[in-house]
């Protein structure tokens, strides 16, 4: 990422709004975080709010009708699961058949990789759509759990959570030119997780993926 930022300062200035590489900052309110279990006996038990924030970089195509979009961002996510199967769950032995409720609070250092296509500019405004993937490295995992009359909060769950999260990234929105080299960026995005969030050897469950819906808000310079 350091190479990307350094290289961006050395690019010739041409293309859309007079530059090949656009850098910016973003903050994405995440209004849906859902842990999605793929087997019976485990249910979604609520969706949490979250936020993404960090650096954006658009490497412009030569015709300025699109870009390779990447960046570096911190992702915060939280969601809950209800384990009804007595043979599954992190505290299945202690729960002795009782339903177990878990709330995972996750943090990732994430790199999005996507192609962003753009419409023609009209009065400083243009539409965009993107399709790609993302890779996230786990940097924080805390857990709240309860079963029967027992409960505990903010347990360190780094060793019980898989260290990598990957998935499909899609989004759409618009850009509006505020000044010669300042563009307002906005839209909506969806992240469909492919990887398993919970370690199966500890949780004795099948795949549990993380899906997210977020608003895209940022400024390019």
Label each residue range with its predicted role.
Residues 17-23, 64-68, 109, 123-129, ...:
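Outer-envelope beta-barrel architecture signal
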Residues 1-19:
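Cleavable N-terminal export/targeting peptides
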Residues 25-29, 51-59, 72-74, 111-117, ...:
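Residues on the lipid-exposed face of transmembrane beta-strands in outer-membrane beta-barrel proteins
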Residues 33-48, 77-107, 137-165, 196-212:
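Extracellular/periplasm-exposed beta-strand and loop segments of Gram-negative cell-envelope proteins
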Residues 104-111, 117-120, 126:
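Outer-membrane beta-barrel transmembrane strands
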Residues 65, 70-80:
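Early exported N-terminus immediately downstream of N-terminal targeting peptides
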Residues 13-60, 220:
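Short glycine/proline- and aromatic-enriched beta-strand/turn motifs that initiate or cap beta-hairpins
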Residues 14, 77, 165-170, 175-221:
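Predominantly the C-terminal beta-signal and adjacent terminal strand-loop region
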